[in-house]
């Protein structure tokens, strides 16, 4: 089949063809960038937190309405830890001050030298009297976990800064690379909390592969975390994080809450939550955006397909006599079908070419304004393929109806 007759027909009635091509171009530009954003957001939401088997982890926040003095609070924390360890199905318990991905907790500035004017980084400040490495399943890539003699018992109301100097610190690999770039090992190095003369030194005794901050930021600072061995009184409540046996999470959570409620010496407020729910809450907006963009993309495909079907149906109606003449002159059904498919392919190709340029332009705008990653060429190739296939499928119905028109019906005068 020659392309020239098809092109001549399109040039004589180019308004419809231009509208379809424009619709394809705009849809391709939006679709490719929307799916690129979806891929980015889903990759962010799927980032590992550093916590092994999150589906088995939960925590209980405890708030005693009558706290008691420092010694009473220390005794209560130890007793509650023992109570939770005794719950059937609890494999590990650790006291802590905050949890990853909760968007609530403490952050400290850290430096490699107290003489620094500016901090090296801002890092999440986790503290524990037990082993977060064991309870959370953190991967220790260098050094060791804390010893019992390194744990400080601090009174938040009375102890001064000198009393709260950590005896050790465990940091993440990302933070180690930030504070001491290129260092072969950071074990034994001193990490300073703060800068200047008041900075608190702590020897690095361990490095974990990954531990997200409480904010779980998208940038690399989302893994800038520190853990220090400490137990604190007169804080903002107490948090116990636990690992349950596989498949026992719901039961263990209920029994752990009941055990704390039963052994409490006074009024107490308990709040239990799973790490899996924290992940859902943290990335709820990302997932909602992804579904919204997917919905928009599907609607665009449906609208584009409807436009192609409508335009092709109109052309079939307008060309009934022309089709009948061609059939009378010996054109086969497959020739008529091929004519409309080729015509649609030409229109779609123009739209795809324009859509690729629009996609690149839109992506450059997003890169400059929102610091997004550049659009991979795979999205352009995939998008082009989708619209070529969509065009062929959408036009097939009207084209088949055109191919079934009989010469006598098409040429019959009104």
Which stretches of residues belong to each language-model region?
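Short beta-strand boundary microenvironments
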Residues: 86, 90-187, 199-214, 234
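Intracellular coupling helices
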Residues: 4-11, 15, 306-347, 404-413
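Hydrophobic alpha-helical transmembrane segments of multi-pass inner-membrane transport and secretion
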Residues: 12-40, 286-321, 349-354
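Alpha-helical transmembrane segments
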Residues: 26-55, 367-371
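"Rare, low-scoring activations can occur
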Residues: 81-87, 167, 173-174, 198-290
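Membrane-helix entry/capping segments
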Residues: 1, 8, 12, 16, ...
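C-terminal membrane-exit region of the final transmembrane helix in multipass inner-membrane proteins
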Residues: 2-6, 383-414
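Transmembrane alpha-helical interface segments in multi-pass membrane proteins
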Residues: 300, 313, 321-367, 381-382, ...
């Amino acid at each position: 089949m020659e392309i020239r007759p098809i092109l001549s027909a399109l040039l004589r009635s180019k308004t419809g063809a231009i509208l379809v091509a424009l619709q394809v171009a705009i849809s391709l530009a939006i679709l490719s960038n929307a799916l690129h954003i979806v891929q980015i957001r889903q990759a962010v939401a799927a980032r590992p937190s550093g916590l092994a088997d999150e589906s088995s982890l939960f925590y209980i926040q405890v708030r005693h309405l009558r706290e008691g003095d420092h010694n009473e609070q220390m005794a209560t924390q130890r007793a509650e830890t023992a109570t939770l360890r005794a719950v059937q199905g609890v494999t590990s318990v650790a006291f802590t001050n905050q949890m990853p991905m909760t968007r609530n907790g403490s952050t400290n500035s850290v430096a490699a030298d107290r003489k620094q004017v500016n901090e090296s980084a801002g890092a999440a400040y986790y503290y524990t009297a037990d082993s977060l490495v064991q309870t959370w399943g953190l991967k220790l890539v260098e050094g060791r976990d804390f010893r019992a003699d390194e744990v400080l018992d601090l009174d938040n109301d009375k102890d001064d800064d000198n009393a709260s100097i950590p005896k050790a610190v465990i940091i993440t690999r990302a933070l180690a690379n930030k504070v001491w770039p290129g260092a072969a090992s950071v074990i034994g190095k001193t990490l300073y909390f703060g800068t200047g003369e008041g900075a608190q030194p702590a020897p690095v005794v361990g490095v974990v592969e990954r531990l997200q901050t409480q904010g779980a930021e998208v940038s690399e600072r989302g893994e800038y975390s520190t853990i220090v061995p400490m137990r604190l009184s007169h804080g903002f409540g107490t948090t116990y994080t636990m690992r349950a046996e596989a498949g026992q999470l719901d039961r263990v959570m209920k029994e752990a809450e009941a055990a704390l409620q039963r052994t409490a010496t006074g009024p107490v407020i308990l709040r239990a939550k799973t790490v899996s729910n924290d992940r859902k809450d943290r990335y709820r907006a990302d997932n909602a955006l992804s579904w919204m963009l997917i919905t928009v993309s599907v609607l665009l495909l449906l609208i584009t397909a409807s436009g192609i079907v409508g335009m092709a149906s109109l052309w079939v109606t307008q060309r009934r006599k022309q089709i009948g003449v061609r059939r009378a002159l010996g054109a086969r059904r497959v020739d008529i079908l091929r004519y409309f498919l080729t015509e649609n392919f030409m229109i779609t190709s123009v739209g795809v070419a324009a859509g690729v340029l629009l996609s690149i332009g839109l992506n450059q705008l997003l890169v400059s304004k929102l610091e997004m990653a550049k659009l991979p060429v795979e999205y352009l190739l995939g998008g082009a393929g989708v619209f070529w296939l969509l065009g062929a499928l959408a036009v097939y119905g009207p084209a088949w109806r055109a191919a079934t028109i009989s010469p006598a019906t098409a040429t019959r005068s009104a």
